Regions:
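Terminal, low-structured helical/coil segments at or just beyond the last alpha-helical repeat
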Residues: 30-36, 238-300
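Alpha-helical segment of the N-proximal tetratricopeptide repeat
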Residues: 41-80, 84-91, 121, 125
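Helix-start (N-cap) detector for alpha-helical repeat units in TPR-like alpha-solenoids
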Residues: 44-45, 79-80, 113-114, 147-148, ...
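Residue-level recognition of tetratricopeptide repeat
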Residues: 53, 87, 121, 155, ...
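Structural signature of tandem alpha-helical TPR/SEL1-like repeats
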Residues: 57-66, 91-104, 125-138, 159-172, ...
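TPR/TPR-like (Sel1-like) alpha-helical repeat modules
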Residues: 205-209, 215, 219-251, 276
Length: 300
């Protein structure tokens, strides 16, 4: 149900009908201003927060941030408003403001695991994986069953060149959330770099069983299959389809952004240089933008 919006937090001044001469000219009329009760302010703040949440779901992050800022003005002691504001600021590329909002939320509710997770994700996005690990682990001590936090922790561990820690985190993530193909895919990324090619192939096939159109496990599987003659025909078919879905994967820099290790990237370069893939590679190069926004968001 849509929240009811208050037309105004202050009523218009009352209109007085005063006969001429009824009031001595020395006395000015003082208009009456309605001061809303705290319960009304709270209702207004929560209604605005709901509207901001809807705007976030619609992808209107900047408008959501403006409404969320009004929410925290009305409800400065409610950590939920600060978390909402931080999320809107983060999605509208206001990282520093988002960090400040999360810090305020944590002051108000230090045992809220979600706030620690959000700070960890922000640190990861800002290229601070070591800080992200500390924040995420603290949050997981409060709520150890958050699959997304384990996934972020795995990504941070990968960036810190800790493949075993990353693999463990990704396995926990997929164990906690059914159908979490992104976590299964990333297990494959780790296993391939560790030289466990067969296990990596199994993971990527599992990921494609969940999401048959996911470009990342499709191309990674193609790369792994191309290592032996029996798999080369399937590999070229999968690679062509993957590049049609997500052309950015033709770029080595984009693969690196998606946490592909050096072994997988080198193997991908070999596969994509095959003459049978020239047309697919040329199309991908023409359409590639290098932007991470076009790929499935959780896979980084």
């Amino acid at each position: 149900m849509a929240p009811r919006w208050l037309a105004s937090l202050t009523a218009a001044p009352f209109t007085f009908s005063v006969a001429l001469g009824a009031v001595p000219p020395a006395f000015a009329l003082v208009p009456y201003a309605y001061v809303p009760q705290s319960t009304e302010l709270e209702a207004a703040g929560l209604g605005i927060a709901q509207a901001a949440s809807r705007l976030l779901r619609l992808g209107q992050a900047e408008d959501a941030a403006r409404l969320a800022a009004l929410t925290v003005q009305l409800l400065p002691a409610d950590p939920r408003g600060w978390v909402l504001l931080a999320e809107a600021q983060l999605r509208s590329n206001q990282s520093k403001k988002a960090s400040a909002s999360l810090a305020r939320a944590k002051q108000l509710d230090p045992r809220n695991a979600g706030i620690w997770f959000a700070e960890g994700s922000l640190a990861l996005r800002d290229g601070q994986p070591q800080q992200a690990v500390g924040l995420l682990e603290q949050g997981l001590r409060l709520d150890g069953r958050n699959a997304g936090a384990h996934f972020d922790l795995g990504n941070a561990q990968l960036l810190l060149d800790n493949p075993q820690g990353a693999l463990q985190a990704f396995e926990r993530a997929s164990g906690l959330r059914k159908g979490f193909w992104e976590a299964i895919n990333n297990q494959g990324l780790v296993l391939y770099e560790l030289g466990r090619r067969g296990e990596a192939i199994d993971r990527w096939r599992q990921a494609l069983q969940i999401n048959a159109k996911a470009a990342e496990p499709m191309l990674a599987l193609a790369v792994a299959l191309a290592a032996t003659p029996p798999g080369q025909s399937e590999a070229r078919q999968l690679a062509s389809e993957a590049l049609a879905i997500e052309p950015n994967y033709v770029l080595d820099a984009y693969q690196k952004e998606q946490l592909w290790g050096p072994r997988l990237r080198a193997s991908a370069k070999t596969l994509l240089s095959h003459p049978d893939l020239k047309a697919a590679v040329d199309r991908a190069n023409a359409n590639a933008s290098g932007s991470m926004e076009t790929e499935e968001e959780p896979s980084t």
